[in-house]
Amino acid sequence: MKQIEGGICAVRGVSAYGIKPGKMGIAVIRAEGPAAGVFTRNKVVAAPVTLSRERIETEHRLSAVIANSGNANAFTGDDGFLDAMEMASMVAENLGLDPDNVAVASTGVIGRRLDVSFIKEHLPEVLEGLGSSPECSRAAAKAIMTTDRALKESAVELDCGVRIGAIAKGSGMIEPNMGTMLCFAYTDAKVPADVLDAALKIAVDKTFNMVVVDGDTSTNDMVLFTSTCKSGVKPCLDCLDDFEEGLVCVFTDLAKKMAKDGEGATKLIEARVTGAKKYEDARLVAKTIVRSPLVKSAIFGKDPNWGRVVAAAGYSGAELEQERLTLSFSGGGEEVELVKAGEISTASDLSLLKKIMANDEIIINLDLAMGEESATAWGCDLTYDYVRINAEYTT
């Protein structure tokens, strides 16, 4: 498996484009084939999520996706649902598709009616620009950005020639439970919808569900996975693990980019938890660490306050014993042990620790010494800018 350029347009049979002339943007992705989806577990659900979930569960295939940024079309009642349907119908009519095979996604401010006239005005330009170049993938990725500072796309080619690519957006309001978080993934493997669904759920659980920026689960979270089947390669039973691994690789890349691009963030935090008795325990501890405001604040201040890490692990609800804990911080290729088997380490190099804390990526390694299970979670520091961005979001 190798990383390749091109984002979603690296996948055979995918064309895309997007524009963002102001606060609102529009992206369209044209790719036909079996499809699967994972959606927010928030009980307040945006209209596009309701519509797209119904279509995935009924049709198990997609021909296109239309996404807008700048307005979430959430908490907008029946009118919002009709607006989402109209968006799908406009794409279907212009491209000669069945509207039931067009998914809709939105991201932005909650509780405001979507300006459908904006979609009508600019959709022709987007459809005219549809193409399969790397620039077209980037244009679509840029169009769905809100408070994101960096474009998020990733693609790999498996040894068998199958390609998997995805674009995503997300920087705030991220704690997916399948953070706002949208992802559109594509492959050219010749696989049915049930295989896509199984691979998607595994990959999302290991990656996007392990990202925490601010602990808020959005009304609009959505991950869609479509196969164009254009490679002609049907992964055999022996290759399905490679297929799932490829999707996990793409999603891990995007998950880390989301965490690093958290609103106002200056540092990526990666919590690696090992030695858990159960996988769920490892997940709980890792996510609790990166969710902790005290840990996030300490990382922002370059303060190696490891007590906050063990405290977070302790209240996570996971099974652990403090006498067994071993903790270290690492970054920039260096590592300092802080706790060993429940005792404060006497080998800590404070000058090296200070150097590690100055890195823009900090890894927290915690061994529970209870078993063999492990998990990794990603988050970011909590900064003054996070408060400013979210205090001024609608004003």
UniProtKB/Swiss-Prot annotation:
Could you tell me the keywords of this UniProt record? Answer: Acyltransferase, Amino-acid biosynthesis, Arginine biosynthesis, Autocatalytic cleavage, Cytoplasm, Transferase
What CDD domains does UniProt report for this protein, alphabetically?
A: OAT
- Pathway(s) served: Amino-acid biosynthesis; L-arginine biosynthesis; L-ornithine and N-acetyl-L-glutamate from L-glutamate and N(2)-acetyl-L-ornithine (cyclic): step 1/1
Q: Which NCBIfam families match?
A: ArgJ, PRK05388.1
Record-level Gene Ontology MF annotations: glutamate N-acetyltransferase activity; L-glutamate N-acetyltransferase activity
Function statement: Catalyzes the transfer of the acetyl group from N(2)-acetylornithine to glutamate, forming N-acetylglutamate and L-ornithine.
- Active-site residues are 180 (nucleophile)
Name one matching Pfam family: ArgJ
Among InterPro entries, the record links this protein to: Arg_biosynth_ArgJ (IPR002813), ArgJ-like_dom_sf (IPR016117), ArgJ_beta_C (IPR042195)
Q: What is the lineage of its organism?
A: Archaea, Methanobacteriati, Methanobacteriota, Stenosarchaea group, Methanomicrobia
Listed name of the protein: Glutamate N-acetyltransferase
Q: Which PANTHER family match?
A: ARGININE BIOSYNTHESIS BIFUNCTIONAL PROTEIN ARGJ, ARGININE BIOSYNTHESIS BIFUNCTIONAL PROTEIN ARGJ, MITOCHONDRIAL
Which residue numbers mark the site Cleavage?
Answer: 179-180
Which domain of life does the UniProt lineage start with? Answer: Archaea
Signal sequence span is none
- What is the protein's species of origin? Methanosarcina mazei (strain ATCC BAA-159 / DSM 3647 / Goe1 / Go1 / JCM 11833 / OCM 88) (Methanosarcina frisia)
| Chief site of localization | cytoplasm
Q: What is its EC number?
A: 2.3.1.35
Annotated site residue numbers, Involved in the stabilization of negative charge on the oxyanion by the formation of the oxyanion hole: 107-108
Q: How does it assemble?
A: Heterotetramer of two alpha and two beta chains.
Give residues annotated as binding substrate. Answer: 146, 169, 180, 263, 390, 395
Cellular component GO terms held in the UniProt record: cytoplasm
Its localization reads:
Cytoplasm
Q: Which family does it belong to?
A: Belongs to the ArgJ family.
Which terms does the UniProt entry file under GO BP?
L-arginine biosynthetic process; ornithine biosynthetic process
The reaction(s) catalysed by this protein are:
N(2)-acetyl-L-ornithine + L-glutamate = N-acetyl-L-glutamate + L-ornithine
